[in-house]
């Protein structure tokens, strides 16, 4: 009986000291491309036990690695492993992205402010969803600054962008 207990204790000690899985970052080269004449890149940020990857295409979070209670790392963001899947996937185009310039739907792709009626491209069964065909999720954002643990992105949509009135400048940190 004493030998069985010793064997069990030894197994527990060995398995509890087993190497925890590590963060597996996506290669930046899988996100290097040009969209609408603008360079797209993948940025890796680290702070403490966290690691996050962000692309300036749509200002989207691509991965977020965090340890569980046992110290094993998991990516908790639903997304793709390469830029082509984000650019060419209209069915799931909003994964990890900033939506806008508005979220949700504009019924019939039209609304009125005062006497002015605005019409937008419809991209969701006769409605305009999350900014329309060329919402913030489909634009290459400017990278204003990047450090080891922070990134600041911004985008400027001119007056009339996809039918929207007025210019819109949107920062994201």
Task: Set out the residue ranges of the language-model regions.
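Sec-dependent signal peptide recognition
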Residues: 2-8
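Surface-exposed acidic/polar loop and edge beta-strand patches at domain peripheries
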Residues: 3, 18-173
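C-terminal motif of bacterial Sec signal peptides marking the signal peptidase cleavage site
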Residues: 14-16
């Amino acid at each position: 009986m004493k030998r069985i207990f010793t064997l069990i204790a030894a197994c527990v000690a060995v398995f509890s000291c087993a190497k925890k899985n590590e963060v597996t970052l996506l290669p930046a080269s899988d996100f290097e491309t040009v969209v609408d004449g603008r360079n797209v890149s993948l940025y890796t940020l680290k702070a403490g036990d966290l690691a996050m990857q962000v692309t300036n295409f749509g200002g989207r979070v691509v991965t977020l690695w965090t340890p569980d209670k046992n110290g094993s790392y998991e990516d908790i963001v639903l997304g793709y492993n390469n830029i082509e899947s984000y650019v060419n996937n209209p069915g799931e185009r909003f994964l990890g992205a900033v939506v806008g310039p508005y979220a949700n739907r504009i019924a019939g792709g039209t609304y009125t402010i005062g006497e002015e009626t605005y019409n937008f491209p419809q991209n969701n069964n006769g409605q305009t969803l999350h900014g329309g065909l060329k919402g913030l999720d489909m634009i290459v954002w400017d990278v204003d600054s990047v450090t080891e643990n922070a990134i600041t992105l911004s985008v400027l949509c001119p007056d009339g962008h996809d039918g929207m009135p007025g210019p819109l400048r949107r920062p994201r940190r």
